[in-house]
A protein has these predicted regions:
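Charge-dense, helix-prone N-terminal extensions
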Residues: 1-122
Length: 122
């Protein structure tokens, strides 16, 4: 999909296909609950989340969302995601619009990245 021209994440969600919106909102909610002081921004046509540095981003594709973890996915987490039916890469995983968001795992990943970032800034 081409990069969005949205200036805010709210605009991005509103402009997204209807079938993607609930998944986008759930990912957004998980990130904000896991790291309440997270900075939500748009860059390169997609939402990014920062806390003492880059944490995660979300890319919209035709049939799924790509969730990118800035420092990558640990092997154990990749295996867990794959067991749940998600395709993974070294730094990302896919959530198809009809798949459940892996809330507990995403929460753990986001909190771990926030902690890494905070330690880097110390």
């Amino acid at each position: 999909m081409k990069a969005s021209s949205a200036k805010t994440v709210d605009e991005f969600v509103t402009e997204a296909p209807v079938e993607a919106r609930a998944v986008l909102e759930q990912i957004r909610s998980v990130v904000k609950q896991a790291v309440p002081d997270v900075d939500e921004t748009m860059g390169y046509g997609k939402p990014y989340y920062k806390y003492h540095g880059w944490m995660t981003g979300v890319t919209l594709y035709t049939k799924h969302l790509g969730v990118e973890m800035w420092d990558g996915l640990p092997d154990q987490d990749r295996k867990e995601l794959e067991a749940l039916g998600h395709k993974t890469g070294s730094k990302n995983f896919q959530i198809h619009f009809d798949q459940a968001v892996p809330v507990e795992l995403l929460t753990r990943l986001v909190k771990a990245q926030a902690k890494k970032n905070q330690l880097k800034k110390s």
